[in-house]
Amino acid sequence: MLTTTTRRHLLTTAAAGVALLATAPAWAELPPLKQKEKYKVGFAQTESNNPWRIAQTESMRAEAAKHGIQLVYTDAAGSAAKQVADVKSMIAQGVDMIFLAPREEKPLIPAVMEAKRAGIPVVLLDRRVDASLAKAGEDYVTFIGSDFVEEGRRAGEWLAKTMNGQAKIIELQGTVGSSPANDRRTGFAEAIKQHPGMQIVASQSGDFARDKGRQVAETLLQAHPDATAIYAHNDEMAMGAFAALEAAGKKPGTDVLIVSIDGTRDALQAVADGKMGATVECNPRFGPKAFETLARYAKGEQIEPWVVNTDRFFDQSNAKDLIAEAY
């Protein structure tokens, strides 16, 4: 039989436990990562059909090799369903951590949650998942990437200034449902809304691909032959737009001004040659920050919910000098 003193002690202990849980930081709910000599880490890439993704993968592989880490690499080939299956395979292989570049915001939520249930921490690279369904510090460790809204805003501000606030714009969007496409569209729209003469006359997805960007640009240029500018969510679609403009008998950089995002070697060369107005960098070299984050997390450090990549801006003033650094 419990004495009054014993009951009071148990109640006090229980109350303290509840209070501790209530005040525990969200990151404490994440699966831990033990410090050890060698890790087996998964990298679930979304695709590998463009220079940006190739550069990102090369950076991850090089940094893993530098630290003696076994990298389990998968390529979803642009399929969210395959990427979910890739993550499940990594879980089955017992990886210590998963770096995930999610194809789209919503479809990859089940993969993130399944990894958490399996006790495997996840770090998102380049793209986010839907924040209403999964949160950094609770369901995954952190997001490492650029500020896509700011990228779109910088592109819009440059175009508005260069065009003196007057332009009929064709927008080539990225993959529907992806965070960079959503955010780059938002940032650009915010920048040009201050200029009534800046009008988006057509906007359609080119899926971040050169060929599809060309096809979409051809269709939209036929529908809007008076367009004076093209805003592409990435450089690959901008390259496709060059071909579409030339096929329409228009001169890129003269008849139609193009602004884009990524900072690839092809884009910087086009800017230097006067074919393209400007491109906002989106740095693909994630390896150093990714594996630095792994090391910090293994030490028990609290990781900020967003590890920000800083990006440069390329135009006629610097593109030629920086081509050698591009990918």
Protein language model annotation of sequence segments:
Residues 28-327:
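A residue-level marker of the well-folded mature domains of exported/periplasmic proteins
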Residues 1-24:
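N-terminal secretory signal peptides
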